[in-house]
């Protein structure tokens, strides 16, 4: 348990940031899952739209410092590869 006033404040700030970061991470994962679900039903146009929305969420998470740049780039590239393979298969 924190003893000093500043340490107590840091506990509150850390919890607030944890909740905020978790919300952003959840939103990013949800958008990625939407892309994958549109790929499974083979809906090319919906997959492209979902991919652009997912890109936006990944970029927001990077700008807020929640995800590292390379992590977001890797996940975006993998999603794009799956969408492109869907497009080329049809």
Swiss-Prot record:
Gene3D superfamilies: Ribosomal protein S20. Keywords: Ribonucleoprotein, Ribosomal protein, RNA-binding, rRNA-binding. InterPro entries: Ribosomal_bS20, Ribosomal_bS20_sf. GO terms for biological process: translation. One of its GO terms (cellular component) is small ribosomal subunit. GO terms for molecular function: small ribosomal subunit rRNA binding; structural constituent of ribosome. Binds directly to 16S ribosomal RNA. NCBIfam families: S20. Belongs to the bacterial ribosomal protein bS20 family. This is Small ribosomal subunit protein bS20. It comes from Fusobacterium nucleatum subsp. nucleatum (strain ATCC 25586 / DSM 15643 / BCRC 10681 / CIP 101130 / JCM 8532 / KCTC 2640 / LMG 13131 / VPI 4355). The gene is rpsT.
């Amino acid at each position: 348990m924190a003893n000093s006033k500043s340490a107590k404040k840091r506990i509150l700030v850390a919890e607030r940031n944890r909740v905020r970061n978790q919300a952003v991470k959840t939103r990013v994962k949800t958008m990625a899952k939407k892309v994958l679900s549109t790929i499974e039903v083979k809906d090319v146009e919906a997959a492209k739209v979902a991919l652009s929305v997912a890109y936006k969420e990944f970029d927001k998470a990077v700008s807020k410092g929640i995800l590292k740049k390379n992590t977001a780039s890797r996940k975006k590239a993998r999603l794009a590869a799956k969408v492109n393979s869907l497009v080329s298969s049809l």
